[in-house]
């Protein structure tokens, strides 16, 4: 009998340890903020994540500040950043100098503002006159290299307009006529929905009367609206994340529906440019963030939603554990409730699990800093993925594809791993694309996925003649980066072959044949390249020889390259 009670006691103690409060409210020195934005970034490249925070302070005044992480303690640094409220911010190394820059949009006493700050190092930030759209309160913005030239580009939406800016690579930006719908109180997110190597754009918000969601498929820099049954929402968030680890990005949307009732939706990506509603059982939430995160280091993306719920005065912050079978269970995390909220996740103390900053209004303006103590509560410590290898390159004119073998990870499924590329014109340089990671250790400077997404390849267009050197790292669901691979290289020759982004190959697919139309009289070379950059076959085509058999091709995505009279045309082909 004594042994029986001892067993029960040990079981209870184990359960108490397992379900002990995983998030510890920690004194951080961060000010109480509402109607704002917050982000982790290693601004001084010292291998720990600093914090930038902006919004409305406890006296209802605009506020903005940077806090340096000193071994887990945060120190306010005078930077001269102009305060904004009702704001959004986004981190990127827009000038490829190895320091994390940021853009912020919102309002202050002078009206609507959008500011770009260049990080000069040592917490010195220079305000850059970029000429960005002043979108106003409740707007959003996001960085991505939409045209595959290595430089981060920027989309801004709010006040019924959406504007895309192409990074010229010289510190300036050019407005692009992309045909994107104008929105109010939007949420924006970039992600490769069709796994073709181009970042696609997800938008959710007020498009005129009710909440709408739009997906723009990026086809070599041209955006085409995808017809879907996805329902959008107003005053919430929209994010990409691979919830079921099938290699396809799923969607999380929160906000208010047409009846002004808070909702939370999950849509599963079927892998064929269609999406299915997933009954995830989430509580409807608006006026706050929605995050895909792996808080428990099991390799599955969990969900946090914070903000206003249905009913007068109701608000909550809820954490949902991914059960690994496409369903979610609420986890009793004990997080503070707030609306007009913002959040940031990152491993600030480098202990192998991601921690949480939560800001918002819960009677008063508040900021909570939660240290994730799951490792001490019998959860596993995260480890980095293996280093990518088997680097491969395909080069045609000023076009190049680099690819690699997929990594593995002890916690994250292989399909969930994202990849991050650094590349420059000299060994070890990043003047073509920045990884926002330490090149020596792989330590991440931001809490984000890799710049290649879940693809095992990355496309570059409009490259200048010269030598190129690149390395690749793998990043798991908890944003832990592997070391970088061995260095690969390739050369772009100064040939007369030029790509044309706006002309496509004119072709039709008939069964197992590709029929090429409008070919020149002179013979041209057609190359079929797999999505990961491997050359499958080459053919000489002409007016009299315009059919290519595809019987031997496996189902998948391929790129057709037609070198026609010194002009390289490219089109995507799906078998």
Summary of predicted features, one role per range:
Residues 496-575:
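C-terminal outer-membrane/trafficking sorting elements
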Residues 475-494:
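Extracellular fibronectin type III
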Residues 36-43, 87-96, 138-146, 186-193, ...:
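Beta-propeller blade termini
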Residues 460-480:
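Beta-strand-rich modules
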Residues 416-463:
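Recognizes extended acidic, P/S/T-rich segments that occur
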Residues 376-389, 489-513:
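Residue-level detector of functionally pivotal "anchor" positions at catalytic/ligand-binding pockets or at interdomain
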Residues 47-53, 98-104, 150-154, 197-203, ...:
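Glycine-aliphatic tripeptides that mark coil-to-beta-strand junctions in extracellular
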Residues 20-33, 68-84, 118-136, 166-183, ...:
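Blade-edge motifs of beta-propeller repeat domains
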